[in-house]
């Protein structure tokens, strides 16, 4: 797996740019026998590709921004509770189907496993999310 032209993104980051990308709509490609890129029919998961890109760029943090304040235990039920922090092990025990927070949790865990800070929360609370004041933070283990 690779991100074509990642060197351009690395250059932008090295110059101090904030890189916002992998928001969906990417074009999946493979390399043909002549090492040329060729489009294929496939789906690119924006959360997983964002975690992959963040690792490739050596990012300190991965914020997965959405329209809900946090990951919820029992989402959609009267007993729903927002989760402020989850360990990787705890996240695996949650029942989060693919159409819900499942891919975001998988991506956040992947990045956290590599030693990075990962969090899921509202776009409007991105700064608070980054500082640990909002959303759900995925950690290797509780401290």
What are these regions (language model features)?
Residues 1-143:
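C-terminal catalytic "cap/lid" subdomain
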